[in-house]
Amino acid sequence: INPLMKIKNIPLLLMLFLVSCKNEPAKEKFSYERIQEEVKKIESAEQTIIVLNSNDLMLFDKTSLSAKAGKNIRLTLNHTGKIGKEFMGHNFVLLKKDVDVDDFAILALDFKENEYIPENNDFIVHTKMLGGGESDTINFTIEEPGIYTYVCTFPGHYQIMQGELTIE
């Protein structure tokens, strides 16, 4: 081996050594527990305010929301994680009653350029796709009482990230 090659490798070996000696605890596999929190909502004569959080573990912090029929709903979706929307995007899509969630989510896969929102009439309202640290607020009203399903349409998320909005 050429002695000059040995000298060129010294900085590389030194850098590898320093990186490997970093004094950080070993990363452990994560675990999580789904906790049902009481829905934080504020009702006034004019509107119901709902704050829904999503995170890098592909979870909404609430799976059950409620509001009154005919009353304005102001919903804010927060992505409390750190991963960008290209890899861990989240949105809130409120489906019309009796829409098949699986069929809707599979169709949504074909609409990447539209933030995974199909160009059909199977949903009532949606937020934009959010990356870590982003938020979006939407305002809407539902006249008909019933139970409406909401989902995140980012690929692979809808099976875990869904819940129900009960309109009384």
Predicted features and spans:
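Short, Lys/Arg-enriched N-terminal segments with co-localized hydrophobic residues
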Residues: 1-4
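C-terminal motif of bacterial Sec signal peptides marking the signal peptidase cleavage site
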Residues: 18-20
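N-terminal edge beta-strand
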Residues: 43-72
